[in-house]
UniProtKB/Swiss-Prot annotation:
Pathway: Carbohydrate metabolism; D-galactose 6-phosphate degradation; D-tagatose 6-phosphate from D-galactose 6-phosphate: step 1/1. SUPFAM superfamilies: Ribose/Galactose isomerase RpiB/AlsB (SSF89623). One of its GO terms (biological process) is galactose catabolic process. It comes from Streptococcus pyogenes serotype M18 (strain MGAS8232). This is Galactose-6-phosphate isomerase subunit LacA 1. The gene is lacA1. It comes from the Bacteria.
Amino acid sequence: MAIILGADAHGNALKELIKSFLQEESYDIIDVTDINSDFIDNTLAVAKAVNEAEGRLGIMVDAYGAGPFMVATKLKGMVAAEVSDERSAYMTRGHNNARMITMGAEIVGPELAKNIAKGFVTGPYDGGRHQIRVDMLNKMA
């Protein structure tokens, strides 16, 4: 499984910490960050890379997480969640089959960011009754 990472200038330091953590956990990391671009361009780069292959997940970090969430949810086939706790990160995989999360470096500290990333990438999709909602989301965009 490849994890696609991106950040703007405000989220880059936290993204680098997440990157190191996930590499230590033996995940394949693809960093699409362009530090000279804003959150919109970096979010689009993460989402595009996630959508290029099955089994990819994305994490985008900026100052607050809200902007990248808004961008990601505009894209066809992208189910994304803005998260600031590890349980939500885990559950958005299980119940929503989210392929991307966004978080804010001014909201989430280093240890919490690692736990969020771990919860997201280890969370299995439960399918079943949740697939109805996922299908509804996919029809919207």
